[in-house]
């Protein structure tokens, strides 16, 4: 993840 564009949810 992480490509959602939301820094609030840093999906590694």
Swiss-Prot record:
Residues with Leucine amide modification: 12
Entry keyword Secreted: yes
Primary subcellular site in the record, as a coarse category: secreted
Disulfide bonds: none
Alphabetical keyword list: Amidation, Neuropeptide, Secreted
A cellular component annotation (GO) from this entry: extracellular region
Domain of life: Eukaryota
Annotated localization: Secreted
GO biological process, one term: neuropeptide signaling pathway
Family: Belongs to the periviscerokinin family.
Further details from the record: According to PubMed:19808072, a longer form of this peptide exists, which is much more abundant than the short form.
Function summary: Mediates visceral muscle contractile activity (myotropic activity).
Record-given protein name: Periviscerokinin-2
């Amino acid at each position: 993840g992480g490509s959602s564009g939301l820094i609030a949810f840093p999906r590694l």
